[in-house]
Amino acid sequence: MLPIVKRDSLLNGLQIIILEQPGSGRVSTHLRIGSGAMYDLAGKGGLANVTSKMLLRGSSGLAPAGLANLTEETGLSVEITTGWDSTDLKVSGPASELETILDLIGRLVISPTFDQKELDSFKSSLISELKEASPRDKETVRQAAIQSIYGSHPYGRPLQGTAESLTAITRPDLTYYHNRFYLANVSQLVIAGDATLDQVTKLARSKLGPWKKGDRVPATFRPPEPVGSRRLLLINRSDTEMGTAAIAQIGYSRRAADYYAAAVLTELLRETAKAPGATVEIEANPRVLAGPLVINVSSPQDRIAAVVEAILDEVGRIQGGSIPPEKVEAAKARLVSQMAERLHDKDETAEVILEIELYELGRDYLLNFATRVNAVTTADLQKAAQAYLKPQSVAIAVAATEEKVKESLKKLGPVSVMK
């Protein structure tokens, strides 16, 4: 059953979307601002993330201690996250506090103070966390592979930045990012719960009407340099019997015309790209621009090269057109089922609606989702496989003991050792 969605907008372009749940006694608000880490300034990776987190460290008439007191007194929960394409502020609480919630959202996004002492303290804590984190975990391997294929493109850097890039971020950088990208007309506010559209629109005019609008910044980045052959990076580690690998390549955009075929193809890979005794996870990251397609692998060190080779062979078979029809139908069914499950959860329903807006998927997206998935043909999958699967030009990062795996990895291509 599709959700009943009610809409309105403010003069500044802010879209208001309501999922009414009368009698629930609670409201969940989700504000999505249509810009994220993709727009970090050069050499200042992590700027979008720092900017968003600093909203909670002081705004007009609300110091950090005041925010803590407010949430405790009213029973509100506040969460802010930064992605590559968006910044998301979520505030939930009793329906009786709806005006307080919208007032808080307005204060946070319209007039943050970016206090210098708070910024210095926050940057210091982030840098300490990065330096104390294990350099050999799954994320390090994943990031090494992604950086290898994207190079200087924004997607090649860590979303949260590095110690060096965080050190370079200044208060004027935050002010610039906020002024340039925190715009009402590239944002949507979804409210699910015990509130009506008229009630929300009236309060939003008062609390969020002053939020400025501006020109949307296009994502006109130079594409990454093509990868001509496999790149193998070995991160030497000696304290474990398990090996970790990430196989990365440039995937597809969420706005791609062949998105449905690409999504079915990814689901098909999740079923077929497996190896005995190994953990294999396939991660697609469709974004405004083509995001990374990553296969994460964990296995005993003495088998890591063989497992990676087996996975690449399977990717090659699918790229070559060896696509089992029965597995295709199962992959389609899983995608349709996953969407149905998302729509049974109010928070996930809000997320789906925001994806529709952010990626301009069309108001008929949910109505036609199952039909479009099921319409994907074997020929469509073969075209998508040719477009998106490149087993001979992937980046492979492996964390394992050099003397145990280097020779076996050489069968896959030239190996560069990262000390």
Question: Which residues are covered by each model-predicted region?
Answer:
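Mature N-terminal segment immediately following signal peptide/propeptide cleavage
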Residues: 1-32
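Buried hydrophobic packing residues in well-ordered domains
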Residues: 13, 31, 49-51, 71, ...
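M16/MPP (pitrilysin/insulinase) zinc-metallopeptidase core fold and M16-derived inactive scaffolds
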Residues: 28-95, 135, 157-158, 269-279
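A structural supersecondary motif
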Residues: 37, 246-250, 269-299, 418
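M16/insulysin-pitrilysin zinc metalloprotease superfamily fold
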Residues: 57-61, 92-123, 285-342, 417-418
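Scaffold signal of the M16-like zinc-metallopeptidase fold and its non-catalytic homologs
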Residues: 101, 133-183, 204-207, 238, ...
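An aromatic/glycine/proline-enriched structural segment found at the starts
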Residues: 151, 155, 159, 188-253, ...
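C-terminal regions of mature proteins
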Residues: 188-193, 296-297, 329-419
